[in-house]
Amino acid sequence: SLKVAGRVEAPAAFCRGAVRSVYIHGLKADHLLYNYEIDGETVPDPYASKIAGREKWDDERRAECDFLVCGSFEEKEYEWQSACCPEIPKNEMVMYKLHVRGFSMDSGKKGKMRGTFAAVEEQIPYLKALGVTTLELMPVYEFEEIEIPKKQKLPGYIPQGSLPEKGSETEKEKLKVNYWGYAKGSYFAPKASYGYSKNVTRELKH
């Protein structure tokens, strides 16, 4: 379980328009996880550059307990200014749209590399041999692939114990999986379960 290191208030005095900001001295972000509390509900930062808690694909343990997904930070600042575009003319472009996990699960790789950005990268020579110049990736931002039913609070007039308990036969059905990823997500964070290395951002950029 996670231990709460501290709680930082963001009062109205720190508000500029619809944005509230605070500066915290002396924090080292290397191993820091954080969330927001908005109107009593704990939620991850929608602009987080990294999400912790979904490193394993289709891990149903996230549905079996009150699993907490948190915002996190990259070890090093993401360098984007040095990146350059191939600038392939549109009339010469051959585009291939793929799903990172689906495309690379049967790539001949074994173990943890299957279904990752690294496995896709190793298939680039094959794609080039086909004449492909450009890849369009299906969602690679962080999203919850398991369709976890929302927990509803029981009204007072329903007796305790009248509904099936957690883990009963009626609740052991396989949860549905949003394989493609077209859903609400953390659009600034690469999907952790698609990463082979610890630094999934750098792996995707590479």
Spell out what each predicted region is:
Residues 1-21:
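Surface-exposed amphipathic alpha-helical tracts and adjacent flexible/coil segments at the periphery
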Residues 122-141:
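Catalytic domains of carbohydrate-active enzymes, especially glycoside hydrolases
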Residues 16, 112-127:
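Short secondary-structure subsegments characteristic of cysteine-rich extracellular domains
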Residues 4, 36, 98, 127, ...:
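Conserved, mostly hydrophobic/aromatic
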Residues 87-92, 128-129, 180:
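Extracellular/periplasmic catalytic domains that process cell-envelope and extracellular macromolecules
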Residues 19-97, 102-115:
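The feature marks proteins involved in alpha-glucan
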Residues 109-116, 147-206:
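Aromatic- and acidic-residue-enriched carbohydrate-binding clefts of CAZyme catalytic domains
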Residues 8-10, 141-143, 193:
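Active-site-proximal loop/turn and secondary-structure-junction residues that shape catalytic pockets
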